[in-house]
Amino acid sequence: MVNFSNKLTKDQIPGWEEYYFNYKMLKGRVNEYTEQTKEGTQYRRRVLKDFSKLLDDEIEKIVLFMIEQQGLIAARLEDLGKRRARLQDIPLLQEITELREDYRSVGLDLVTLLKFVELNANAVRKILKKFDERLGYKFTDYYVRSRSNHPYSQLQQVFRHVGIGAVVGALSRNLSDLEERQGSYLNIYDQHPLAIPKDPIIDLITATADKLTNSTNFLRFLGQHALIAQADSTAGTEDEQHVGEDKYHLMSLVLNLANTFLYMVNTYIVVPTADGYATSLGAAATACGAVIGSMAVAQVFSSVYFSAWSNRSYFRPLLFSSVVLLLGNVMYAMAFDLGSLTILLLGRVLCGMGSARAVNRRYISDCVPPRIRMQASAAFVSASALGMACGPALAGLLQTNFSLYGLTINQITLPGWIMAFGWLVYLIWLWISFQEPDLGPDAKDFYEGSSSSTSTRYMEQEKMEQGFTEHLLPSEQDEEDDNGDEEHNETLSSSTTTLRPASSVASAYTLLTPSVKVQLLIYFMLKYAMEILLAESSVVTGYYFGWDIGTVSVFLAVLGLSVLPVNAIVGTYISNMFEDRQILVASEMALLAGVMLSFKLTVEYTAAQYVCSAVLTFVSAEVVEGVNLSLLSRVMSARLSRGTYNGGLLSTEAGTVARVVADGTITAAGLLAGEGRLLNATLLPALLVCVASIAATLSTYNSLFY
């Protein structure tokens, strides 16, 4: 494995050597400090002070050089602008071509500067990690906290690279103007960003900047929300890109998205009528928690076997999912005429056993080419959100009551019959149109954790995932390069083993850092709060306000429809103004306020109080979910980005367990406290979990560095 010091020297840009981070010198200082502290000749505070000063000097050198180079690029753009102005009246084709090439040359210089920043950022992160490991200090937390949050922060100058955006804008505008001299009187500010003609150099700059730090536009925000592994757009060889194109089949992708949509509709279509169904079978209205939650109980187990099954096939698990969901919905609908609560619950359990969301995620991650994977990830999240909104809305429309061949068709049973018909149509469509991708034996072995696989393709992907997106804090991926500093003869076989996906729950758990554990706790908290709100909505609103099924359905549909606009606002605007960790804490506080506002503390409980608190709780939970999964996709080990026990499965399991616990809480509280005390009895655990998650977030705040 290549020694990082040698790699740093090898990758340096000729003429810029003196401005690079002096990793070799600082590594030597760390070794000196280690020996001195062992001998007792150096005090801890003195070591921290000396090393902080050395780091500050090195980072200042990098920042000042970066600003100097940005100034030179800006001066060149100004000169080119004057040349372009002279061509306005007398456009000469040859001079326009030369000017366009000069603009592209500036763009290439900007790419070079971005690579300079990336290499230095990696060096800073690695020396911080090495310092903590050798001396046993938590110096990284102190350094990041004290430097990144300071108003004169030089770290932020590197991480935010605000001037880069201005240069890209100037290049885009001028290249677009030179390219479109005829037939158009619009400039880039009059057009939608997606409609602007892009020069290849702009795409190269964007790809390099995205590798340096994750961009926070709406599309990427939704993609991270799905927690689907994203490949670097510049990563991989042409052969690898060709393999991705060979696997890709548009109709198969649409079928996976349709499966996601239908499953979310299936989950929430019963919420407005679950209490009425329970009472019609002789149970308490609060048994709606058991009716709704039984599907989540089964999903806890189905997510694991579907994730494992997708190692070998995509068609067969989707086929099995469709059949099981078809049968489950038929049982759900027939339970009314059979007068059996057991049949009702078994039907919902069968529906939960058909949850193929792990397969849908995996298909997008493995079989969709990198060029459109982010769009597919965003479509996955959008399909889930629309399904969540359409479920209750559809239930509100099914207001009828008649018999057909001895079967009762009413607002309680129709959700089951409608979904059974939907899954039957989907099953036929799947059988006719789905195309099974060729996984190949090497991919199967690798994803299943087989020791026989020595594929280097995934090693290269792991290397590309290393870098500035991890920022300064240590991660599992750093072990490779750090070991390279000490052992130069590490073999390819051991390297592949290090990069192999987790092969069991136990091995996946060992990869969970404190930051990842807190992120999963936050995910549990927000899903718990949302499930409490949604699952008991029909009981609470019926008891306090006398709402009918139609009103509850509209209320839940409006909440569901808020998902995409909220994500759009956060992903497009708010995340560009604040750090993700700041948004996370603020939205958790807002969620806590929503839960507190929901309590019935006075004699009169108004619909206005309930609606306002519900909207605040739900919207805050959506913001928390998006930002939390965005952060989770950065801080989790690369080994959790693929395989059976991947990050998507872990987050799904955390959310599903939260739903099970929440539905169980509703049922238990209804039996023990009755409908009159149900609201406060279920909100109290949600309040405690929310407080615990905020405390955990603050305790790991510095590990969530953006």
Curated annotation (Swiss-Prot):
Keywords: Membrane, Transmembrane, Transmembrane helix. InterPro entries: MFS, MFS_dom, MFS_Domain-Containing_Protein, MFS_trans_sf, SPX_dom, SPXM_SPX_plant. Residues 475-498 are annotated as: Disordered. PROSITE patterns: MFS, SPX. Gene3D superfamilies: MFS general substrate transporter like domains. It is found in: Membrane. Residues 476-488 have a biased composition (Acidic residues). Residues 2-145 form the SPX domain. Pfam families: MFS_1. GO terms for molecular function: transmembrane transporter activity. CDD domains: SPX-MFS_plant. The chain crosses the membrane at residues 251-271, 281-301, 318-338, 340-359, 378-398, 414-434, 520-540, 554-574, 583-603, 611-631, 678-698. It is a multi-pass membrane protein. It comes from the Eukaryota. One of its GO terms (cellular component) is membrane. The keyword Isomerase does not apply. The keyword Membrane applies. Belongs to the major facilitator superfamily. This is SPX domain-containing membrane protein OsI_32082. It comes from Oryza sativa subsp. indica.
